[in-house]
């Protein structure tokens, strides 16, 4: 009872002075866990409290401990007194805490720690001697980090069950012999960041369970005691980083004693400066093998130590190396994972023990050179493989650009073409009618051009050649050439020389619509002068066609076959207009015949046998010859005007299909464009078939008939083609001798002046210009054979072979050339020419006055005149 009263009194007194007896404001909890025989501690604390609170807590703590019942004391196993500003601590006052297992006195200013647990000598204490025996039997963890402790606490040996001791961040300067003596259960000692200079080699003597010794960031310089400790405890983990080690020859001898892996790590420790080390960086663990081969002559310093330890087993050791900065401050929470972990757990956390691990070796120069050479070769090969196609391509382009003669060959080829074109032009000059060239009837003499400005409105089409079965590379006989031209001229679209012809006279009905065609008129003679051999066989077929067209334009007229489409385009015209115009043509033909006789040309014999007819025919030829003398003046005038002037004097029949064409420049150009459009949509094969079909029904006949001296005279033209067996009928022969009888009346007509003839023609032309629509094609085209200024010599006159029984048809006149349906010629025709024909002499004939633009007069008024 006395004890109870005393306790109540003390409690009341404490409440009066303090004001309250409660639990401290800052609470900390400590949990102790046991796993596999090891202790693990976890704690949390608040370190920022005032000094007054610490004092109150300190007083209340002791009062509470003092007056606690014994039943509660036994259940207290974790006690945390961190950051309480304690300077001196005596564990004797905690002797009644028999269940205490972990005591944390870190982050204080403790500079003296008394662990004397001896019993007092008083009688009262003697009475309770048995009660205080074996105090703190379960204390296993003692944490004293971040204090001001110097030497090892006294009486530490009395803590028999102590397993872990943390003295980090204190002021220890050395470890003596008796520092940890008696702590047989001690497993881990943390002496990090102290000022330890020396360690006694036997400081850890008797600590057979020792596993971890942390000596990082200390002031150690000598390695001899460390080597002794390593040999004593082969499984000991030593933290030796961040120390100023002094390596000498004895250390080199130690490397010979230890294994190769230990020697490499030891060399790294000696050569690594302290400043380069990083905090809390664990180095690899090295285990020293038991079979240590001692050198034959070890150093004198270690010889005695090795002999003293020779009897002890050498099981090997693990040296734990890590780095830390000198100025780093390690907190209590940073060390909790190290203090309470067993050596096995530490090794597992660090990746397990590494045996015989080798550090980085010095680089091998030979290997580096070999690797560099190999890599260089591989890179060069790859670059060459990838760049080779591009290099070859550039080389080929350069060779093509610099190839000699490539551009010269092209220019030479063009020059060759120009020379060849010039030769074609010269060969064209061999024709009899050089006036045709001077009149610029063919503006483009290059046969390679597809379209030529031809006054006839004819367009040369290559498809015509294909439809007629012509091969440009092959040479054809005159007969074959006539066949091909004959097939195209049947429908009125092409001359026999290969040129496309379009209707020129619009508004006139065809001759077939007014006059039936007799079976005997299917074929008429065509002068063999139109068929001549080519000048040179190497020239193309197109050149032959050009030459023949030029000659044909000078020798005679070009009647064209009349197709069925002509009826729709040509309206009916009065016959008296044509009849009046035919009189003038007859007069011109009479003068032509007379002059031809004077020059020695054979005169054609008219079919009607009339003297008046011969006179009229000669008048027509003579008028045409007079027009040819005006060649020089025609060259200065526009092409269309010259053509209109020449065409106005062509022979026309009384049938509307043979009326002369009267066209202006605009009409000729538009007709030419129309011809190109018609030929563009032309199919050669279909057109050939159509030609044969149309030729069987239609034809043209050019005749000169006379019904009286002043009556109607008409020129009829028909073309017919007999398709029996695909062969043409033989041509009628000509008899040039019979025609000479018709020349007797030529002198009677010579008195007619050319001026009257021109006036008549102008009047008729003006009258016909109002009614007729001219096109690119004319039914009849006449030109004279020679110029007055450049008369033809006998050597210039073309000759051709004719059968002796040849006779001129009734429609043939001297100086005219009729193109109709031409059948194939059975015999070859030779064209003889002179070298003088190759030149184009400038004709100095006086220019004729231009055609008067007077208003056209009525034909009836002209007849009255």
From Swiss-Prot:
Subcellular location: Membrane
Biased segments, Polar residues type: 470-479, 702-713
Glycosylated position list: 42, 248, 787
Membrane topology: Multi-pass membrane protein
Alphabetical keyword list: Glycoprotein, Leucine-rich repeat, Membrane, Phosphoprotein, Repeat, Transmembrane, Transmembrane helix
Taxonomy, superkingdom: Eukaryota
GO annotation, cellular component aspect: membrane
LRR repeat start-end pairs: 138-160, 161-182, 185-206, 209-230, 235-255
LRRNT domain span: 728-759
Intrachain S-S bonds: none
Name the record gives this protein: Leucine-rich repeat-containing protein 66
Organism: Rattus norvegicus
